[in-house]
Amino acid sequence: RKETACLLEKEVSRELSELGMKSVKFCVNITFDQDESGIAVNGENIKFTKDGFDNVEFLISTNPGEPLKPLAKIVSGGESSRIMLALKSILAKADMIPCMIFDEIDTGIGGRTAQVVGEKLSKVAMNHQVICVTHSPQIASMGDVHYLIKKLVKDGRTYTVVTELNEEERINELSRMLGGVEITENTQIHAREMLNMAKEIKKNHLSMSKDLNAFTTFKKEISI
C-alpha cells in the first residue's frame, strides 16, 4: 500500500496540474491503531479489520502555505470536483461505481484548462456514466448528450424544465454559451467546430482504448 501510495501521489499531482491546479499538494496518509488484542507487527500489537491494519486517508492542500487537510473537508465544489476527476481518471477501470456526477467542475477555469477537463470527463465516461453540470462550452461540447436546464414561472410558481437538445439546438446553445445572449454567425461556426473537434477526440479515445485492450490481451497470451 505504501509503494502504491507513492505512485498515486505522483499521478494525482500530474493530473491536477493538467486540470489547472498546479499549486495543489496531494498526500496519502497511512496510519494504524494499536490494540492489545491485535496482531503483532514489528513488536507492536496492531488492530486488524477486514480491510487490513492500515488507516488510509487522502490529504490535500489547495493553496501555497496551507497545511494538508483531509480531502473530505475541501469546501470549494469546483476544487472538489476536479480532485475527484483526477482520481477517477487514474482509477477509472478499477472503480466499480456505475454513475458519477460532477457539479460546477468548471468553477474558476476556462479556455485550454476547461478543454482538458472536458477531455478527461470523456475518457472517464468510457467506463462509467458521467453526469456533468457545467456553464463551460468546452466541457458541454464533449458530452454525448446535451440537456438544457431552465427555470420557468407559470401561474406564480417556479418550475425547472429539462430539455434534451438535438444537433441544431445544441449548436445554438453552445453559441449562446460562447457569446452571451446574442447568437451570431461567428459563434455558430465556432460551436460547430467545437462539436466536430469533440467527435474526433472521442473517436481517438475509443481507438486508443481498443489498441490498449488488444495489447493487454496479446501480453496475456504471450505470458501463457
Regions found by a protein language model. Give the residues of each.
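GG-anchored amphipathic helix commonly corresponding to the ABC/SMC/Rad50 NBD signature/C-loop
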Residues: 57-58, 62-64, 78-100
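Conserved D-loop-proximal element of ABC-family nucleotide-binding domains
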Residues: 69, 94-95, 107-115
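Walker B catalytic acidic pair
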Residues: 103-104
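Short pre-catalytic strand/loop immediately N-terminal to key active-site residues, enriched for Gly-Thr
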Residues: 44-47, 68-75
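C-terminal lobe/lid and adjacent interdomain/linker elements of RecA-like ASCE P-loop ATPase modules
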Residues: 56, 112-224
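Charged, surface-exposed helical/loop "interaction arms" that form contiguous linear patches used
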Residues: 1-37, 41-43
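Phosphate-binding glycine-rich loops of NTP-binding sites
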Residues: 15-18, 79-92, 119, 125, ...
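Flexible glycine-/small-residue-rich
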Residues: 28-32, 60-62, 87-89, 151, ...
